[in-house]
Amino acid sequence: MSLPVVAVVGRPNVGKSHLFNRVIGEATAIVSDEAGTTRDRHFGEAEWAGRQFWLVDTGGLVEDSHLLMDTAIRRQVMQAIEEADLMLFVVDAKVGVHPSDARIVDILRNSQKPWMLVANKVDDPASTDFYEFFRLGVTDVYPVSAQNGKGSGDLLDAVVANIPEVEEEERDAVRVAVIGRPNVGKSSFVNRLLGEDRLVVSDESGTTRDAIDAPMRYHDTDLVFVDTAGLRRQSRIDDGVEFYSALRTRRAIDSSDVCILMIDATEGLQNQDLKIATMAWEAGRGLILVINKWDLYEDKTDKSADKFKKEAVEKVPYLKFVPFLFTSAISGQRVTKVLDIVLSVQEQRTRRISTSEVNDALGDLLARLQPPQAAGREVKLNYATQVEIEPPTIAVFGNNPEAIPEHYVRFLHNGFRERWGFTGAPLRIILRRKNS
C-alpha cells in the first residue's frame, strides 16, 4: 500500500517548515518505538480523519547559495509536481503577493496536478487581509497560522478531501521492491531478470508519477517488481534527488512484500545501505541482500563471501537472519537464483506456527533460562501464541511483562528462530500481561 504524498512548496521564509511541523503535530503522527521508521528530517507519515499520507517539507531544497533564487524555487516546485499527489503552496499573508508567487501559480496551474494555496501567518483572520491572494486566480485560500495552529484543522480536512483514496490491495502476487543506493546496478539486475522485451507495464492512477509495475511468473507464482520506473529513469532534475530518493524508497518498501537490497561489492557495505536495510526490516518486509558486481571484487578467494557476510553481521546483528546472494547483473552470474530466495522468504514471512508448537518452544526456552527477578519478585511467563503473520509476531504472556529486560527478549527471539528459522523475515516478540 503506497500512501499519497503531500508536498509543501513556496518561497523561503514563508513558514513551510513551521507549517510542516504544525501539521505533523496536529495530525496523528504514526510513530514506532523502533528508531528510523516514521520520521525523517524532511518527511513524516501522518493520519487525519482516518486517512494516512506522507507530508514532505521541501524547505531545504531552496537555500542553495550557488543557485539564483527563482531558479531554485522553480526546481523545488517542479520536483514536487513530479513526486507529489497534492501540493500545498504556502504564501506569506503579512508580505502579500510576491512576484515569485505569481510565477509559481503559473507552474502549478500548468502541471495538471491538484494544489492548494495556503496563506500562512494569519494569526487573526479578521485583521489580516489575505484576500488579495485571490488576485492569483485561485478559488480557495486557506488561512492558517503555523505559529499558533489556527486554521490547521480546516486545512487538513481539505487535504484529505483532495488526496487519492488508498485501497488495500488484494495481493495474489508477491510484490518485490529492488532498493538501494544509486548506481549499484538495480536497473541492470531487474532487466537481467525480466528481459527488456518481457517488461510488461501498467499505469497506476493516483500515484506520485507514472509508476511502473513489472510482472513475471515463476514456478506457478506471480511476482511483481514494484516501482521500477524509479530504477530505469534518471530524474530530470539534479538538485534534491537524494531528498526524494528516501521517500521513493520508503514508498517502494510500503508497496512490497519482499525487498531486495542491492549492494555494490566494490564499495562494500555503506552506512546508507544499512539505513535502507533497517527501513525495510522495521517495516516488516522480507529482506534479501544481493551483493552485485561480485565479479569485480578484488583479491577474491573462496572465503570472500563468508568474510563479507561476517563483517555485515558485525555491523548489524539482525543481518545474520537475512539471506545473502553474490551476483553480477552484467554477466548474469547467479541472478536468477534470487527468484527462489524471494519465494522462500515470502513463505517464511507468511508462516503460521500452531499455538501448541509455540508453547512447546517457550517451555524449552524456560527450561534453559528463566527470566530474571524484578525487585525480588519472580517473573513468570505462562504461555505464548502467534498473533500475526507478515511479519510473524509472537505474543508471550506473563505476570509482569514490563519487568522483562531486553536481553531476555533477545533470548526468546533467538530461541524461536533456532526452532523455525523465519529466514529473511522479521520476527516480532510482544510481551503482554496474562489475561489482558
Curated annotation (Swiss-Prot):
Question: Where is coiled-coil annotated?
Answer: none
Top-level taxon: Bacteria
State where GTP 1 binds. 10-17, 57-61, 120-123
Under Pfam families, the record lists: KH_dom-like, MMR_HSR1
What keywords does the record list, in alphabetical order?
A: GTP-binding, Nucleotide-binding, Repeat, Ribosome biogenesis
Query: Which function does this protein serve?
Result: GTPase that plays an essential role in the late steps of ribosome biogenesis.
Q: Which family does it belong to?
A: Belongs to the TRAFAC class TrmE-Era-EngA-EngB-Septin-like GTPase superfamily. EngA (Der) GTPase family.
**What is the protein name stated in its UniProt record?**
GTPase Der
Lineage, opening ranks: Bacteria, Pseudomonadati, Gemmatimonadota, Gemmatimonadia, Gemmatimonadales
